[in-house]
Structure formats: structure tokens, C-alpha cells
Amino acid sequence: MPQTTSTPSPVIHRAGTNMRPSPEGIATASFLVESLVENGENGGLTAMRCALEPGVMTHWHTHPHGQILYVLSGVGLAERFGGPAEELHAGDCVSFAPNERHRHGAAPENAFSYISIQAAQDGSAVTWLEE
């Protein structure tokens, strides 16, 4: 008898169907987060789309395996601890090294949206630090 294998179906997240407010205490104000990929296993990728109003910045944080941000729209800022804030525009991509202290957010006069990709370790993909 021939052996059949089933091909897994793609997982599709329809835009805007999973938008929720960010957790409290991780930024200067709440912003919208849409989970795209959730895999909290060690080394498993997580991905989300974030939309920030003008001037909203995350607090300083790190990711155990680093982070990639891909800018969708608006003007944003990315800052490595001790370095200058770099302006980001649609189509830009920025990566942060594992455990590198950084923050990112919307420029003062512009909304900002991006996709972030990061891998988890011990069930967590981020460690939030001081403001």
C-alpha cells in the first residue's frame, strides 16, 4: 500500500485580526502589537507587527538571540545603548546583536510601523530593562 504523507497547511494571519495593546511598562506609551508567529521554544522564532504613534519609544531591552526590525511605514528611530539614535524609513532593516541593549520607536512627528523577528530562549524572546 502506498504511504501518504500529509503536507501541513500554511498558517495565515489576516492583517489586523490579532491587534492588541502592548503590555504596560515596556514603552513611553501603549502601542499596537499583532502577533504573527509565536514559538516560545528554545531557538523558536517569534514575529510581530507593531504600530506606534508619533514619539512613542520602547524602553531599553535585549533579546537573547538578537532582533531584526523591518520598517513598514513612517519614520522611526533605533538606538544602541551608548550610540546615536539612527533614523529609519520604510524598507529599512536593522539588526541588533544577541543581548545588545537597545530601544526603538516612532520619531517625534511621525507614526511608525515595523515587523520584528526574534528567537526565544527559555520561553522568552525579550528582557525589558529600565526606561
Regions found by a protein language model. Name each.
Residues 57, 62-90, 100:
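A short beta-strand-loop-beta hairpin characteristic of the jelly-roll/cupin
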Residues 77, 85, 89-90, 98-125:
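Ligand-binding loop in jelly-roll beta-barrel domains
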